[in-house]
Structure formats: structure tokens, C-alpha cells
Amino acid sequence: MKKLQYIDRLTNQRVTEAVCYEKTMTLLYTSRLGKWLSTLLAKTPILSRIYGWIQKRSWTRRKIPGFVKRNHICVQEFKKSLSEFSSFNDFFTRELRPEARPIAQGDNICVAPVDGAYLIYPNIAEFGEFVVKSKHFSLSKLLGDASLVEKYASGSVVFARLALFDYHRFHFPVDCWAGPTRNVNGYLFSVHPMALKDNFNIFCENKRTLTELKTEAFGDVLYLEVGALNVGSIIQTYAPEKRYSKGDEKGFFEIGGSTVIILFQPGTIKFDADLLRNSRMGLETRCLMGQSLGRSLGE
């Protein structure tokens, strides 16, 4: 299996990503049998529900210390000690100490909403220039709303992929008035890069949620959470029709990998140069929640 590489934003170094359950992922996405099996898993939600139920059993706590060690996760950032987690899912949905993720200051600064690997495309209309032709992507299919497609079709898009070892709570990227969340039922295909390499439309087929944010600095912003293999539950902890500050918690994903997608209207944001440079090279940039993504063009 070809090793996955990304740019670590803290060091600006190219890093090879540790793949959780690498042998299983190789089987699922490099063999005919594996691809058939992965499709079966994605289209059979009861299997994800069973897996999620298992991960909430108390005996799964035994997996936590080894998982933390293998993935070099910093326990000093946790609100709880390792011994306090009631299950592996409880650990997976962990909260962090506020000081662990400082928020970039300035009303005109948009921040990363999650810990994850980021790809940024400043013009959705030119999306094909940044990805190989086999990676089909339909904004209409993703949003399922003609008025939203018209509104964001010439804007920008941010993809943030969360790995299994990441902190899985998602946050508001800007100061905003948050509208209600709309649920779109779908499958639970993996969003691992091995699965995405041939088809970006996985995002359009998976279970997802959409929330529109009203902002003063960035216009309207569309926020999507996309489920993935074994992620049957996207939990919203925010209350709709209220004002929030950037960095405030919006919700969390239960066990599994997942993705956040953010859409901006045209002419509203200038992304940070390093993120654009890496994305143009086809490299994800690993960011921490609260780091700058870009600044408002309306300043």
C-alpha cells in the first residue's frame, strides 16, 4: 500500500501518516473481495450500529492505553484521565482542556473547526484543476438543494478529514448565528484516502448534516458533517438559532473516521498561503482546531 503523506503545519515537515488497522484497510481497498465487502458494510447500517454498540461496552476500556501509545496521543490535553473513560467510545469522543487548542484571535480570522487533514479549493468551479478526473464531485448531489448550489457554486470549499486517532469534536470556525441542522440520510462509506482516490462522490453518498451560519465577516457559510464507515452518529450539542463564538463546540462524531466540509460564498475569504500551496501539490495539511485557515476579504 502506498504510504499516505501530509504536511504537519506545526513543523512544516512532510510526514507519513500512521494508518490504523493498515492490513484491514489494504484488504478493503486493493482487492476485488475487499471492495465488495466495504460496499456491503457501507450500505448495511445495522453493522455500524452493532460496532458502535460494542465500542460503548465497559470492557473496551482495555484498548485505550495501547491505542494512545501506538498513535502518540497527548494525554495531558484530556479533561479526563485515562482511568476515567467508561468505554472506548467515551475516549473517542473525549473533551480537551481549553488551553490545549488556543483560538486564533481577530474577528476577521476563520479558524480550523477540527483537528484533521485539510484540503482547500478556493474556487469550487475550478475543482477539476486540483483533483484527478476520476474523482467525481457533484455539489448538487452533496447539498440536495438548488438554492444552496446557486449560492455557493462559485465559492470556496474546505475538506477536513479526521483520522481515527484524532480529537473528534467539531467547533464553529467563525463568530456566527447558527441556523438549524438538516439531516441527509445516506450510506457510510469510508473517507480514508484509499477510498477517496477514485471517487470524491463518496461525500455526496454518505450520511451528512448541513447547517448554515450567518456571519458579519464572511457572509453566509455552509457547514457539513459527513459520516463514514462505522460512524452512524453525528451528535449536535449546540442549540440552533443562537449566536456562537469561533471555537465554541458544535458537536461530535461517535466512533470512526469522518469529515467536515465548509463552503464559503465567492469573494469572502483569503486562505492562508501554506494551505493553498500544499493543496495545489495534492498534499493535505494537518491542522489543529483553532489554527487560522484564512481571513475575511470584507475587512
From Swiss-Prot:
The organism encoding this protein is Chlamydia felis (strain Fe/C-56) (Chlamydophila felis)
- The EC number of this protein is 4.1.1.65
This protein's record includes keyword Iron-sulfur: no
Quaternary context:
Heterodimer of a large membrane-associated beta subunit and a small pyruvoyl-containing alpha subunit.
* Entry's family note: Belongs to the phosphatidylserine decarboxylase family. PSD-B subfamily. Prokaryotic type II sub-subfamily.
Q: Which GO terms describe its molecular function?
A: phosphatidylserine decarboxylase activity
Name by which UniProt lists this protein: Phosphatidylserine decarboxylase proenzyme
Query: Which Gene Ontology cellular-component terms appear in the entry?
Result: plasma membrane
**Which cell locations does it reside in?**
Cell membrane
Q: Name the cofactor(s) required for activity, per the record.
A: pyruvate
Record-linked InterPro entries: PS_Dcarbxylase, PSD-B, PSD_type2_pro
What top-level class of enzyme does the UniProt entry assign?
lyase
